[in-house]
Amino acid sequence: MLLHIPEVLAANFAQHSLRALQGADWIDGAQTAGFQSAQVKRNRQLPADSPIGLQIAAEIERALMRMPLFLSGALPTRIFPPLFNRYAEGDGFGIHVDNAIRYPPGESRGVRTDLSATLFLSPPDTYDGGELIIQDSYGEHRVKLPAGDMVLYPAGSLHRVTAVTRGERIAAFFWIQSLVRDDGQRSLLFELDGAIQDAAQELGVGAPSVVTLTGVYHNLLRRWASP
């Protein structure tokens, strides 16, 4: 399931963050890639301990935990702290898949990467290329979103970033460990939750059918969830 989550960051905060990141010190992105990914990765990355990066990352996490759409779609149990990348003209990232386990800096307990997230910070009209292309059984999905918007997708998906041909593309990227690791089960719960919300609006929260469906949702979550 691919999920577009609009306005994770307010427009003014996204603009402020972009200006701050443009003035930060960046390193070669290949330094943080695995052996296979390093062969196809051409970008810059903000060091994980960058003060401005940590500040913006914390705001992203706070914003997400206030968003019902994210909570319903991801069912998050752990979030790998957001990182930041920068693609200048000629930069891109070839086809690859994300590592199954990621270790936050200074932690020995890994995060299982059930979901990948990209939050765009550069307005789409300021650069050409730089599209996130995600492959699944339905084909290729090309993603280029407004500043402050985010896409959520299964971390096991093959994906790439097309070469930037004008301007630059700055974005946050990170991973989520979900209560429900199976993407199909998580998608069913997301659709069921949406149907319950629609029914509650139409019939009322206390309507018998709404209560019954809510019980089905929680019983499925109880069956499928693992902390």
Curated annotation (Swiss-Prot):
Keyword vocabulary terms for this entry: Dioxygenase, Iron, Metal-binding, Oxidoreductase, Vitamin C
One GO-annotated biological process of the protein: DNA damage response
E.C. no: 1.14.11.-
Domain Fe2OG dioxygenase: 78-178
Binding locations of Fe cation: 96, 98, 159
GO molecular function: 2-oxoglutarate-dependent dioxygenase activity; iron ion binding; L-ascorbic acid binding
Enzyme type, top EC level: oxidoreductase
Cofactor note: Binds 1 Fe(2+) ion per subunit.
InterPro entries hit by this protein: Oxoglu/Fe-dep_dioxygenase_dom, PKHD_C, PKHD_hydroxylase, Pro_4_hyd_alph, Pro_4_hyd_alph_FE2OG_OXY, RmlC_Cupin_sf
Cofactor requirements of the protein: Fe(2+); L-ascorbate
Superkingdom of the organism of origin: Bacteria
UniProt: 2-oxoglutarate binding residues: 169
NCBIfam families: PRK05467.1-3, PRK05467.1-4
HAMAP family found in the cross-reference section: Hydroxyl_YbiX
Designated name of the protein: PKHD-type hydroxylase BAV1196
Natural source organism: Bordetella avium (strain 197N)
